[in-house]
Design a protein with these regions (language model features):
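His/Asp/Glu-rich metal-coordinating catalytic cores
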Residues: 2-37, 42-46, 51-220, 224-226
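Hard-cation-handling environments
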Residues: 188-283
Length: 283
């Protein structure tokens, strides 16, 4: 999380997450803020938002899809915390209050916070992820959040926005990325190699973003494979299907969804053992 403030007294917090390690790592305590911008629904960006709302009555601003998926992520975080015995700074009462704290905005739609005008732009990270453009009386700032300018199977890339100040993450800033299409072909080749020798390719992947990308790649390159889809990613995908305005190719996503065999019961899980590929949530 990061607090932005200027001399007009306008103040916002951008994201407030936790690191899902064992035990989890929590951020410094946020000062009181009336408004928080949530760029997307990964737990390292939303994990502490229920605490924020419960303690400060903060309004959460995000896209409709981010708000929908966040509820699922929060409930899963609470469940895992209870099972593993790690303390969580917020409880179910905070979560319930947070669900009513959302104000959702479309891409390109201006809204006001204090003396500032703000609007979201597509970040290209996962569907619903946003960059935030902030127009103050003195300057224009763009907060990139987690962004990607490349086109991926389910979301278009971020576009350049003119600004005076650009705040951008640098996680992969010093790395040379391999060509995405080459990596996709390498994944399909390795999967087919495993299947050809009678094995089952088990692919663990993040529930929001990576699972769906992998399934789209396999569907488009090797539709003859029997692929089973398990874990929380199935529920995330349902939210995507209900918010198709954030999807690059909704028709392609629907076709993949019908093609993949969803694991919804113990008997489905037994059947999956005979599949060619199992794509499931990490852990």
């Amino acid at each position: 999380g990061c607090v932005l403030e200027d001399r007009t007294g306008t103040r916002i917090l951008i994201d407030y997450g936790l690191a899902p390690t064992r035990p989890p790592k929590y951020p410094s305590e946020s000062p009181p803020v009336e408004h928080a911008i949530i760029t997307h629904s990964h737990i390292d960006h939303i994990g502490m938002a229920p605490w924020l709302v419960g303690h400060h009555g903060t309004t959460l601003h995000g896209t409709e899809l981010t708000a929908a998926v966040s509820e699922m992520m929060w409930r899963d975080t609470y469940k895992v915390s209870s099972i593993e015995g790690y303390p969580l700074p917020w409880d179910m009462r905070d979560l319930d209050v947070a669900l009513d704290a959302w104000k959702t905005h479309n891409f390109g739609e201006w809204f006001n916070v204090g003396e500032w005008r703000l609007r979201f732009h597509r970040a290209g990270h996962i569907p619903g992820a946003a960059m935030i453009e902030i127009e103050t009386p003195e300057l224009r700032l763009l907060w990139g959040g987690d962004m990607d300018t490349r086109i991926s199977p389910n979301v278009g890339g971020a576009k350049a926005i003119e600004c005076d100040i650009l705040c951008i993450e640098s996680t992969y800033g010093g790395r040379e990325h391999p060509d995405r299409k080459e990596e996709e072909a390498r994944l399909v080749s390795r999967v087919q190699e495993v299947v050809s020798r009678g094995g089952v390719a088990l692919i663990p992947a993040f529930a929001s973003g990576r699972c769906q990308d992998i399934l789209r790649i396999l569907y488009e390159a090797a539709p003859h494979l029997e692929v089973h889809f398990d874990g929380m990613g199935t529920r995330v995908t349902q939210h995507w299907l209900n918010n198709q305005q954030y999807i690059r190719d909704p028709n392609g996503l629907e076709k993949m969804w019908r093609w993949a065999r969803k694991v919804r019961s113990k008997s489905d899980r037994k059947k999956a053992l005979g599949a060619d590929v199992i794509v499931t949530t990490s852990g």
